[in-house]
């Protein structure tokens, strides 16, 4: 029950694991959750469909997702770090 509640609230796997440990529950069951899709939905709800406009905006979104408990790899994939981003104003 705690698991479903936290996922509905938009928390990621790291936060979920921490909450389960605090409650004294072992997180041995593998959750069938697409964390990338979950992170994209949380980011879209908070920031809309627009991609980060500059390095400051990128960092703000990354901090938000990290605070929600998503992994660094998931955050980079959601924010498009795989694509070449040039935030410098030439």
From Swiss-Prot:
Cellular location(s): Cytoplasm
Main location: cytoplasm
Similarity field: Belongs to the RecX family.
UniProt-listed Pfam families: RecX_HTH2, RecX_HTH3
This protein's UniProt keywords: Cytoplasm
Name of the molecule in the record: Regulatory protein RecX
InterPro entries (alphabetical): RecX_HTH_2nd, RecX_HTH_3rd, WH-like_DNA-bd_sf
Signal peptide: none
Keyword check for Cytoplasm: yes
Gene behind the chain: recX
Entry annotated with the keyword Cytoplasm: yes
Top-rank lineage group of the source organism: Bacteria
Protein's organism: Acidithiobacillus ferridurans
UniProt function note: Modulates RecA activity.
A Gene Ontology cellular-component term: cytoplasm
Gene3D superfamilies reported for this sequence: Winged helix-like DNA-binding domain superfamily/Winged helix DNA-binding domain
């Amino acid at each position: 029950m705690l698991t479903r509640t936290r996922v509905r609230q938009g928390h990621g796997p790291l936060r979920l694991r921490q909450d389960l440990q605090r409650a004294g529950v072992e997180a041995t069951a593998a959750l069938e959750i697409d964390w990338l899709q979950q992170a994209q939905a949380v980011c879209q709800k908070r920031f809309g469909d627009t991609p980060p406009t500059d390095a400051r905006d990128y960092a703000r979104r990354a901090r938000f997702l990290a605070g929600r408990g998503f992994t660094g790899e998931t955050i980079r994939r959601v924010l498009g770090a795989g694509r070449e981003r040039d935030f410098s104003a030439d």
